[in-house]
Amino acid sequence: MKVAITGKGGVGKTTLASTLARLYADEGRTVLAADVDPDANLGLALGLSEEEVNSIVPVSKMKQLAKERTGANDQNSFYKLNPDVSDLPDKLAKDIHGVKLLVMGTVDTGGTGCVCPDHVMLKAIMTNLVFRRDDVVIMDMEAGLEHLGRGTASMMDQFIVVIETGARSVQTYVRIKELARDIGITKVRVVANKIRDESDREFIRSRIPAEDMLGFISYSPTVIDADRKGLSPYDCSPDALDEIRAIKAAIDAKE
């Protein structure tokens, strides 16, 4: 199972990504959670301490490793565009509650289409992840599909957009669905978070096709409190855990 979770900052995609990862780990599955958001906080949501999270060097910052794998150096402008990185996900991952956390980071291309060694290695690792046939891979991504090439995207089982009740949030779903269609992906699912009442549900249902909906997560002060304290929502909110468990069942049913 390969799942990409995206959405604007603050909508709760990391809550969903971290809880799904731990639920799959509870089943004894090999789970690799990749944090591909520049505001990397998936580690905290999985249960790492702030000190542990701060000690992790994102893959995108491992410039020497990128040079070694691509063969790049100061004297040579040529390097491998498809380096062997098959050993890196397991070697670089941090284990937490049965989940292997891989903090990817991002490479700022400035809109130039950069193919620098850092970017090449990052792309190669992400491609490698989706070909790990028997593993569960969950990617926590910023609002877009820029990190996924057409080939990588075609291997994903689920694209999930996390939204809130609001026109701007719904527009994010519309934009990502258009981007997905451009690279050949026709199925984009939605999880609506921070739902307070039935009117919120009706707002979402009136704007999102029923076949795209995976489920709802209620507004939860305990989840917000867990975030403030740097704790895992999995450990703090039984209600949210039950709702995400139901969303997981819907994901598995669509596999």
For each predicted feature, which ranges?
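Switch II (G3) loop of P-loop NTPases
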Residues: M104-G110, C114-V115, M126-L148
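Hydrophobic positions on the alpha1 helix immediately C-terminal to the Walker A/P-loop
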Residues: L16
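Inter-motif core of Ras-like GTPase G domains
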Residues: A124-R133, L148-A167
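N-terminal phosphate/diphosphate-binding loop that engages ATP/GTP or pyrophosphate donors
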Residues: L23-H97
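Walker A (P-loop) phosphate-binding loop of P-loop NTPases
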Residues: G10
